[in-house]
Amino acid sequence: MEFKIVNTICPYCGVGCGLGLVVKDGRVIGIHPNKRHPINEGKLCAKGNYCYQFIHSKDRLTKPLIKKESGFVETTWNKALEVIAENLKTYKDEIGFFSSARCTNEDNYILQKFARVALKTNNIDHCARLUHSATVTGMSACFGSGAMTNSIEDIELADCILIIGSNTFEQHPLIARRIMRAKDKGAKIIVIDPRRTITAKNSDIYLQIIPGTNVALINAMINVIIKENLIDKEFIKNRTEGFEKLKEIIKKYTPEYASKICGVDKELIIESAKIYGNAERASIIYCMGVTQFTHGVDAVKALCNLAMITGNIGKEGTGVNPLRGQNNVQGACDMGALPNVFPGYQKVEDGYKLFEEYWKTDLNPNSGLTIPEMIDESGKNIKFLYIMGENPIVSDPDVKHVEKALKSLDFLVVQDIFLTETAKLADVVLPAACWAEKDGTFTNTERRVQLIRKAVNPPGEALEDWIIIKKLAEKLGYGDKFNYNKVEDIFNEIRKVTPQYRGITYKRLKIDGIHWPCLDENHSGTKILHKDKFLTDNGRGKIFPVEYREVAELPDKDYPFILTTGRIIFHYHTGTMTRRCKNLVEEINEPFIEINPDDAKSLKIENGDLVKVISRRGEITAKARITEDIKKGVVFMPFHFVEANPNVLTNTALDELCKIPELKVCAVKIERI
């Protein structure tokens, strides 16, 4: 009887908790705490504790599938790859790729390289487009980098923690532990959220904002801080530019003015601003409740402005800290799984010559299409789509639009571990290994690169993602460009072409991981960014004054409620993995909609009633959950349940700067069934 513990990293959110997979007779049978891990110190959330339960699911894909008139039939790898290769040759100029935040750095690197080297296209994107593209665009403009500025451990050192648009206690529970430690030491916690979440219930001040009014509220806090002279004059003078213009624009954003927009008492705005402004070390934490709007970039810039004018950047216990929602969404961005940048955020238009030298081939010098653009162009300028580890028919806005787009393709390939809702539409389905069945690296929300380790073999004929892409490259005659014998070979190439990873090696990652940038093998990594200068062209932080703008779809007499969406503690994204975990399903396995008691009374809806939720794009059915935790006029639904997927209802309106959809707000009506 073989029995072993394999230390690896959790496959869910972006915290990057360490855990041990308990293996017996070639199967993972449980989780062993990794008490030495610097992030979670042996603790795990519910999802982490039961993450092993989907590994050996009977639903796992085990053989390649080709769709015939009668449905899917099993085939050989050789046949499947030949069919894909022939279609790639046919549609060479009309191809798009979706990469994946669930896959390793190595998997993402090799797919974006395959797209660019073998197909000469920059039409590659992944789900960061739907979550933190606003962060990358906004923070890069202000700071020169779109990543979390401080480490997770560092949060404990803050005197004030401003949490906006993040239910940290449910979605990043091990970061919430750090927040509570800071609170125990005297830190003040400010929470801004339309829902009175468990995070809000643990705050010192709670501002129950109307969804989509973040910019007005943040600007009002800045107004108070300037008026009360709580700014850091030396930091502004020596480290930033643009403050005078901000002062002018911010004058109209008085607490009284913002209160009418945000639905928050002006005294709470004033008190929050004073607490943040008076703190010696103030940290900002945010998530999708800031980014998933048509003005998401503006909200990110506003938060950066708030941090810069108070000098809360570049030192312990401070910073602007966007929490990543997926295990490797940071890494997928780092690897260049984006249409406008190569690995290391080197812009396509500026960096293509350099990568032509690296990869010894001609490259396309023009930026490619984003996910929303590829969806819109499906059946027109995009005829072939290759999707690795993404489920857009559940996760993307306006599901009917996505389904119609995917069905209009001439050829669709899906590479995944389960036959997802998206995979069911594919012409060819390729069975992939899950995270427990491969070696590689993930990069977590704080830029910490960590090793994941293979614990068991993939089921049946399933293969690691990078091996599948390598085999496909060989079919197209590009085997010499993908001559890797093991996954570490790919990482060594990543180091050469990605400046932030240059000093990181597998050997150095064996203990605690390393925060990028790590410039050489003697460098210990960088826990705090922007200590002495920003990563902008002149080293100064750029203050960008931003104005409040309304959301794309406001409630009206026909659709009087604002629907906002999100996650719950027991499930993850489209539910593909967590809804195959017995213990998590036992906690909750049915969709619901949260409704304020006053709204429920006016609609004659009682707790547990089935209701229809209807938008201009579709309708779904769910059980009513009556709660004072949701603001009047606002309703909330999680998007884990495909049988009542709120993305049937959501709007495809985009932030024009980063192309993120406005997933956090759409107008709906509710009818009792």
From Swiss-Prot:
Pfam families found in the cross-reference section: Molybdop_Fe4S4, Molybdopterin, Molydop_binding
Domain spans labelled 4Fe-4S Mo/W bis-MGD-type: 3-59
Catalytic activity: oxidized coenzyme F420-(gamma-L-Glu)(n) + formate + 2 H(+) = reduced coenzyme F420-(gamma-L-Glu)(n) + CO2
Cofactor: [4Fe-4S] cluster; Mo-bis(molybdopterin guanine dinucleotide); Zn(2+)
Family listed: Belongs to the prokaryotic molybdopterin-containing oxidoreductase family.
Function: Catalyzes the oxidation of formate to carbon dioxide, with coenzyme F420 as the electron acceptor.
Protein name: F420-dependent formate dehydrogenase subunit alpha
Organism, scientific name: Methanocaldococcus jannaschii (strain ATCC 43067 / DSM 2661 / JAL-1 / JCM 10045 / NBRC 100440) (Methanococcus jannaschii)
